[in-house]
């Protein structure tokens, strides 16, 4: 069950959208510099938590402060890059019992809308596809900061989190305690303006 939640969180992570730029601009999510993360948190039998991440993903976003409806984000996650710091558990999560990474090797997020809530905050909506199922999700996001880096690039960084119900993606958690039926997806991204 943890495995399934990991994938969902990875996809959801891609959903962060920049909240304030002077004009419309395209950004590439900086995964090479380890400035972007797709992480998840799921209950372990209602007694503690399992934390993990998806280590391979790519994406981009466009942001227009004057026309937020034109803002967009696209992310693709390699499901088999799941890492919960326990190799045997990871293999089980990636198996047919949960994420079935051999049949569904990628998870994707494509935004469909954004609603600004002021003070560098807003709610991103979009379609998350995981385990062959596509569902609409909402993720509150926050602009952490933006500006020029020491190498002459312009960057913007965001974070967001949301809860995902695994059964919505065809992942059967009925044999596990109810606390394990949902996972928290957390993402933080730095984008480099192109």
Where are these regions (language model features)?
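Low-complexity, acidic/polar, glycine-enriched regions of mature
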Residues: 22-194
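Gram-negative bacterial Sec-dependent N-terminal signal peptides
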Residues: 1-23
């Amino acid at each position: 069950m943890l495995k399934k939640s990991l994938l969902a969180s990875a996809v959801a992570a891609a959903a962060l959208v920049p909240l304030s730029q002077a004009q419309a601009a395209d950004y590439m999510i900086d995964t090479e510099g380890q400035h972007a993360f797709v992480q998840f948190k799921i209950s372990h039998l209602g007694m503690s938590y399992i934390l993990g991440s998806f280590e391979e993903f790519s994406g981009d976003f466009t942001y227009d402060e004057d026309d937020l409806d034109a803002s967009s984000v696209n992310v693709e996650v390699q499901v088999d890059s799941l890492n919960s710091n326990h190799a045997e558990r990871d293999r089980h999560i990636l198996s047919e019992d949960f994420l079935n990474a051999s049949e569904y090797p990628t998870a994707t997020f494509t935004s469909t809308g954004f609603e600004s809530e002021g003070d560098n905050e807003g709610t991103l909506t979009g379609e998350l596809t995981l385990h062959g199922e596509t569902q609409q999700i909402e993720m509150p996001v926050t602009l952490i900061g933006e500006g020029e880096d020491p190498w002459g690039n312009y960057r913007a960084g965001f974070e967001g989190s949301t809860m995902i119900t695994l059964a919505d993606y065809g992942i059967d958690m009925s044999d596990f305690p109810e606390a394990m039926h949902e996972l928290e997806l957390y993402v933080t991204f730095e984008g480099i303006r192109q």
